[in-house]
Amino acid sequence: MAFCISYVGALLPCSLSTRTKFAICHNTSKLHRAAYKTSRWNIPGDVGSTPPPSKLHQALCLNEHSLSCMAELPMDYEGKIKETRHLLHLKGENDPIESLIFVDATLRLGVNHHFQKEIEEILRKSYATMKSPIICEYHTLHEVSLFFRLMRQHGRYVSADVFNNFKGESGRFKEELKRDTRGLVELYEAAQLSFEGERILDEAENFSRQILHGNLAGMEDNLRRSVGNKLRYPFHTSIARFTGRNYDDDLGGMYEWGKTLRELALMDLQVERSVYQEELLQVSKWWNELGLYKKLNLARNRPFEFYTWSMVILADYINLSEQRVELTKSVAFIYLIDDIFDVYGTLDELIIFTEAVNKWDYSATDTLPENMKMCCMTLLDTINGTSQKIYEKHGYNPIDSLKTTWKSLCSAFLVEAKWSASGSLPSANEYLENEKVSSGVYVVLVHLFCLMGLGGTSRGSIELNDTQELMSSIAIIFRLWNDLGSAKNEHQNGKDGSYLNCYKKEHINLTAAQAHEHALELVAIEWKRLNKESFNLNHDSVSSFKQAALNLARMVPLMYSYDHNQRGPVLEEYVKFMLSD
């Protein structure tokens, strides 16, 4: 009698739509797909397949009018940057607290890259005068919380003890704070920067969240919407451009510089849209010329989806166009190889495929089926080409580091295939150790690290090994959220290879809700570790990489906000916002 189990294939972080289950039977050697759900994004240019570049060009509204508008933009654009810089400088000189609010606004609206020098000077002055808990005693909850968050975000240590000033004799936060909505919101935001062991920040998060949730019903509509958005998407753990749309409304007419800053943010968005649209055309052209989706007709043919990852990860650095396009190629191959392991290969073929990647040897693919052989050889060609581009741009060849990530990824996929063939679930710890590799996070971040010119021989350059703990935390966050999203949206029957079911196998009396809560607790722990690792990587050369890596983790709440049709309307809305009017 054949023994069959239902198994969820490697749920890559790139799986923006819900993955389907695969039935693996012991009396066959193939992995059979039940049915891949097509992409349900209702986004211009994404129809679940690859439109030719000319059609994609039309779908993205790149017409003569929009291009002519772009040609006229720079004159006003530069003037608006200068005007904003002047206003920021004035506030930095005359109003320490409002200058911090101004800095926060530039971050939330995604225009801070224009004012790095001015922002650094404001933060330097503020840190010199406010870092002492004694001095913080004379400031409001909102002011101290904002100061704390901005300093930690920018690598300046402030003790969590500054919040002791807001506790009463009972050791609990003071009762009068319950009426300070603005202060509580900022306290909640500040608590997202906590490290492991900072109990007072755990208390601050719980206190502020409970009070704000309890008060939502009695708030006016605009305030309720604003507070609700911040509770759902705290700034530190979310994508700035996504949360910035709501913050634009929050600014209102409170500050005289608000209108100027909003106008600059809109101009910035126009520039970014133009760049992203052009990059998507490049990606579509590359994908069509590659032609692998024609050989692997069951594989996911979603270049738009591939590109979305690079667009969001590098959303803060519009100048890194080449890096976004090149990184998208790596994302595409994670999808393809995942599909090779989930759909095409027998276990014996998957072993040969993995050995070929491990050897990085074209001839080792000779015994593979033609479609698998073509995929493997094209992977080697593409990554060798990426390494050559990095060498030409930055003066060093990272091929060994890049090869290592692909070897590890394929080996992790192979472990999954063997687990599936055995019909048994691994322990929760075994699962998580392997799945954080099969998530694809290491591949993406190592490629990004090298594409940004890090890890070379230049003096003072950070080493790739210095980022391993940071990458590990991001990979675990993704894997756990991926499994949580799958559990919610795929109606798992308890026999699939998710962390939740591996954990429940070891704790047989645990309910699904308790297992879910346990996974969320692990996510919270990894965010604390990620905060600490990010803070410790306080080196000028790595700041852009660090921000991009955090953006990878920040995609999680966008990815797993599914509706009843298993679409991701929140992410869909964000991508539409970034690509079209």
Swiss-Prot record:
**A Pfam family this chain is assigned to:** Terpene_synth_C
- Cofactor comment: Binds 3 Mg(2+) or Mn(2+) ions per subunit.
Keywords of the record, alphabetical order, are: Chloroplast, Glycoprotein, Lyase, Magnesium, Manganese, Metal-binding, Plastid, Transit peptide
Q: Which residues are glycosylated?
A: N27, N206, N319, N384, N465, N509
Which terms under GO biological process does the entry name?
circadian rhythm; terpenoid biosynthetic process
**Localisation:** Plastid, Chloroplast stroma
Enzyme class comes to lyase
Q: Report whether Manganese shows up as a keyword of the record.
A: yes
Instruction: Give me the reactions it catalyses.
Output: (2E)-geranyl diphosphate = tricyclene + diphosphate; (2E)-geranyl diphosphate = beta-myrcene + diphosphate
State where Mg(2+) 1 binds: D338, D342
Task: Please tell me where Mg(2+) 2 binds in this chain.
Answer: D338, D342
Q: Which cofactor does it need?
A: Mg(2+); Mn(2+)
Q: In which pathway does it act?
A: Secondary metabolite biosynthesis; terpenoid biosynthesis
What does the sequence similarity comment in the record state about its family? Belongs to the terpene synthase family. Tpsg subfamily.
Protein's recorded name? Tricyclene synthase Oc15, chloroplastic
Provide the species name: Antirrhinum majus (Garden snapdragon)
